[in-house]
Amino acid sequence: MVSCLCFRPSRKTKLKDKSHKRSIRNQTSSSSAQPAGTAKEVDSSSSQTVVQDSSRYRCQIFSYRELAIATNSFRNESLIGRGGFGTVYKGRLSTGQNIAVKMLDQSGIQGDKEFLVEVLMLSLLHHRNLVHLFGYCAEGDQRLVVYEYMPLGSVEDHLYDLSEGQEALDWKTRMKIALGAAKGLAFLHNEAQPPVIYRDLKTSNILLDHDYKPKLSDFGLAKFGPSDDMSHVSTRVMGTHGYCAPEYANTGKLTLKSDIYSFGVVLLELISGRKALMPSSECVGNQSRYLVHWARPLFLNGRIRQIVDPRLARKGGFSNILLYRGIEVAFLCLAEEANARPSISQVVECLKYIIDHTIRKERRTRRRLLGGNKDGAGTSRSPDETMMRMLEEEEEYVTSEEAIERRRVIVDDARTWAGMNRRGATPPTPTP
């Protein structure tokens, strides 16, 4: 992998209220351990506990009437999204503050558990790349969560089914979104104590503010990670098709590396412009609908350009070498063996490297185009000729035997790491 795999350990942030930390751990464990249809109903006293302790969690209790007024009685014109556990409305408080209100589905017990986990998690966890919780409503049978309003919607809204006139995201914006999401995940994994497994990372759960700054949302499936003497958390498999790590989908064993796999899928979506579970219309014959299965052989065979989103290719503004590096990072995260995947801190450093070099390339290209250029014989070249030559140089590298062999070495390194971890040996340092 590239030299940016070096990273600095993150500072831990402990959840100071230990009694409530245990309470949340119990709530998150109970939210998934029971098989569907047999889970014990969460009684209203659990929700009342949240209400009574709201001052300790720095969030506001809203009345149902207050939120109904804010959302114009939850009418369709206020509707901004639907999810697996509820419907989201845009609202405006009497203070003028814009908000997003998620009304949890009353038809299932799981919705009440989701409510408890989400409110408690977001009350304790605060980071610039996590959505901010304003408060909640637990009045009667109503369960509503109130967030900051994110004006640009989700990443999913900017990748698929674009409206007429809607611009596709450029390379730098896509990589900045990936970096912000990775930083949010790094906070959950490295700074929260105990670590938090997000468990529901996908493009529809990454929201964007007016500057395309991403924030992770929807924490109803989040769980505390394993304690020091355990390698994983065993739980009922939940999540979205196309994003679940294979070891979690097959065995229910959940680790921080399960989130890394999901992040790899998101990064691959950002680069390819394809859904994690592709429509059958995009598949040929018996081809798998899973994006990962579609893209992996293309990556291994050096057919990088077939992976990239055509809209991204048309916009330009990126280097073929950096595109190749981005896909490398995605497939490191998508290693079949959990122990072969990088940590989220390593992923953050890799993405910083890619963005830094993207910005440098922009500046270098601008200087060359504005200042003109000359070939080796001293003959001036036009801006178009200069750009064409730069693209040819990059293409020569990406399709070279060296680059193809490098891809195979990355896969071999991942397998070596996984094998040695299974045997309890110390794995070697990844190839730089």
From Swiss-Prot:
Biased composition range(s): Polar residues: 25-35
SUPFAM superfamilies: Protein kinase-like (PK-like)
Positions carrying Phosphothreonine: 235, 240
Domain Protein kinase per the UniProt entry, residue ranges: 74-354
Alphabetic keyword roster: ATP-binding, Brassinosteroid signaling pathway, Cell membrane, Kinase, Lipoprotein, Membrane, Nucleotide-binding, Palmitate, Phosphoprotein, Receptor, Serine/threonine-protein kinase, Transferase
Tissue expression remark: Expressed at high levels in the stamen and pollen grains. Expressed at a very low level in vegetative tissues.
Biased composition (Basic residues): 15-24
Activity regulation comment: Activated by phosphorylation at Ser-234.
Knocked-out gene: effects: No visible phenotype under normal growth conditions.
Enzyme Commission designation: 2.7.11.1
Phosphotyrosine modifications at: 147, 248
Topology relative to the membrane: Lipid-anchor
Entry comment on modification after translation: Phosphorylated at Ser-44, Ser-47 and Ser-234 by BRI1.
Covalently lipidated residues, kind S-palmitoyl cysteine: 4, 6
Subcellular location: Cell membrane
Family annotation (InterPro entries): Kinase-like_dom_sf (IPR011009), Prot_kinase_dom (IPR000719), Protein_kinase_ATP_BS (IPR017441), Ser/Thr_kinase_AS (IPR008271)
GO MF terms held by the record: ATP binding; protein kinase activity; protein serine kinase activity; protein serine/threonine kinase activity
Swiss-Prot/TrEMBL catalytic activity: L-seryl-[protein] + ATP = O-phospho-L-seryl-[protein] + ADP + H(+); L-threonyl-[protein] + ATP = O-phospho-L-threonyl-[protein] + ADP + H(+)
Principal subcellular localisation of the protein: membrane
Catalytic residue list: 200
GO cellular component: plasma membrane
Family: Belongs to the protein kinase superfamily. Ser/Thr protein kinase family.
Protein role: Serine/threonine-protein kinase involved in the positive regulation of brassinosteroid (BR) signaling and plant growth. Mediates BR signal transduction from BRI1 receptor kinase to BSU1 phosphatase. After activation by phosphorylation at Ser-234 by BRI1, CDG1 phosphorylates BSU1 at 'Ser-764' in the phosphatase domain, increasing the ability of BSU1 to inactivate the negative regulator of BR signaling ASK7/BIN2 by dephosphorylation at 'Tyr-200'. The full kinase activity of CDG1 is required for its biological function.
Protein name: Serine/threonine-protein kinase CDG1
